Amino acid sequence: FKEHDQAEMTKFEETAKRVFGGAKVVGDIATMNQALVSGEIDLHLTGGTYSVSPARADGNPNLRGITPKKGPMAGGKGGISWIEVTSTVNNPELSPLAVEFLEYVQQPETAHTVAFAEGTFNPVAQMGNPACFDLFTKEELDAIQWDSLEEEMARSVEYDIVPDYEKALDLMTAAKRAKG
C-alpha cells in the first residue's frame, strides 16, 4: 500500500506474466469455482471466503479459502482483509431514506439475507448481535468458514489504498490478455 518504483513495477509485471502464463484457467469467481468443483484445477488465486462459499454451500466443503501463514505484508502477514460497509455520506442533499435504509439493513433478518446475497456468501458485522448470529444454520456457518474466520483475519492486514493501482491493474490486465 505504497507507491512503487520502476523496479518494483517491473517485478510485478514479470510476476503477473508468470502467474497468468502458467494458469490453466483465467476467469471470474463462478468460472473458477466450477473448475475447482470439477477437478479441472486444484487452486485459484486470489480468493477467500467470498470466492468459495457458494461452492461450499452447494455441497463442496473440501473447498476452502486459505490465508497464507506468512507473507510480504506488514508484520509478515500473508493476506489482506477487505471489509465493506454501508453508510451515509457527507452529502448536502442526502436522501431522506438513507438513514431508514441503514436501520433496515442492520436488522438481524435483513443482515442474514445480505450475508447470502447471490454469488458470494460472507460473514456480516451484525453477526456480533446474538439475534442475528442465531439466524445462521450450522451449514451456513460452515459455508462461510466461520470456524477459521478469526485465524484468517489474524493473518491479514487491513486493505488500504494502492497509490499506483491503475498502473498495476493495466499490467495485470495485459498479462491476463496475453494468456488468451
Stretches with model-predicted labels:
Residues 143-180:
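Conserved C-terminal helix/tail region of periplasmic/extracytoplasmic solute-binding proteins
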Residues 49-53, 71-73, 93, 108-109:
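Solvent-exposed loop/turn segments at secondary-structure junctions
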Residues 1-67:
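Ligand-binding pocket segment of bilobal, Venus flytrap-like solute-binding proteins
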Residues 86-152:
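Mature extracytoplasmic/periplasmic domains
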Residues 13, 17, 33, 37, ...:
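Non-transmembrane alpha-helical segments in soluble domains
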Residues 61-80, 89-90:
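Short beta-strand->loop
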Residues 27-30, 92-96, 159-166:
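Soluble non-cytosolic domains of exported or imported proteins
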Residues 83:
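Short coil/loop residues immediately preceding or within conserved phosphate-binding loops
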